[in-house]
């Protein structure tokens, strides 16, 4: 393996990358499981939480003119992915994956930052009132997600891993499945359906930071406005 410093590395604030060669190529889901298990055995709190994303862009090592560059070679055999995966009871089960203490706090912070979708007096709020996360999945995304033995977890059907979707208070969902288009996003039921049913419309618009300017948002609004259950909630809102 190799350890080298990033451009922002300082002796008083070290920032290092660890490269571990594997004995075979791995799929995206395998990489996530392997990376998390290796990090856990070293100290998962030392690793940035983006470490486990399979689509990582790695830059050539560099350092500032007055910086300190660190480079170390670690000699040994190539890491066997299968031996790491075998350390799980079932590596396909995402609920077994080790996480840092920060990750739980991040999701909690995201929930606090996002407005309760049920309190929104608009089309989004009406959709979220008509369909909580479980009912939205059952009604519109049953070919995308399937329930697990745990009521607050779902599996992304195309993935090799299972139980990677966590439901919070039936209002939000967060997918840990690496290949899920909704991976890494805290979504209410409106946005969960938007991402999967109309996300392909966004194309080059993925760089747009305001969701309301995305083609998928417009399409989802039209879809929601035409739904009978949503119409009932909108009528109740107007009469309130």
Regions found by a protein language model. Name each.
Residues 2-4, 19, 58-61, 154-157, ...:
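Residues in well-ordered beta-strands of folded domains
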Residues 1-10, 45-50, 162-163:
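Catalytic micro-motifs at enzyme active sites that drive phosphoryl/nucleotidyl and oxygen chemistry
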Residues 164-169:
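Short linker/helix segments within small regulatory modules
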Residues 15, 20-146, 170-173, 179-180, ...:
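DNA replication initiation modules
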Residues 138-163:
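Short, charged low-complexity linear segments at domain edges
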Residues 8, 64-65, 158, 177-178, ...:
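Short, flexible beta-strand-to-coil junctions
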Residues 10-11, 27, 163, 182-183:
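Eukaryotic short linear interaction motifs
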Residues 170-239:
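Short, small/acidic-rich helices and loops at N termini and domain boundaries
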């Amino acid at each position: 393996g190799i350890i080298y410093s990033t451009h922002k590395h300082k002796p008083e604030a070290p920032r290092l990358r660890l490269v571990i060669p594997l004995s075979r190529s791995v799929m995206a889901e395998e990489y996530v499981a392997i990376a998390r298990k290796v990090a856990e055995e070293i100290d998962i709190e030392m690793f940035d939480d983006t470490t486990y994303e399979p689509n990582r862009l790695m830059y050539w090592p560099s350092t500032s003119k007055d910086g300190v560059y660190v480079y170390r070679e670690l000699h040994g055999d190539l890491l066997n992915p299968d031996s790491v995966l075998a350390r799980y009871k079932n590596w396909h089960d995402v609920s077994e994956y080790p996480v840092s203490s920060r990750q739980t706090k991040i999701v909690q912070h995201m929930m606090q930052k996002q407005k309760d979708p049920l309190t929104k007096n608009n089309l989004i709020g009406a959709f979220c009132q008509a369909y909580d996360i479980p009912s939205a999945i059952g009604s519109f995304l049953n070919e995308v997600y399937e329930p697990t033995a745990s009521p607050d977890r779902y599996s992304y059907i195309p993935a090799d891993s299972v139980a990677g979707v966590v439901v919070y208070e039936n209002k939000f969902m967060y997918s840990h499945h690496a290949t899920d288009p909704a991976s890494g996003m805290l979504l209410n039921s409106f946005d969960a359906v938007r991402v999967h049913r109309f996300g392909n419309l966004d194309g080059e618009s993925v760089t747009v930071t305001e969701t309301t300017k995305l083609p998928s948002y417009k399409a989802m609004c039209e879809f929601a406005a035409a739904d009978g259950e949503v119409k009932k909630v909108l009528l109740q809102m107007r009469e309130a």
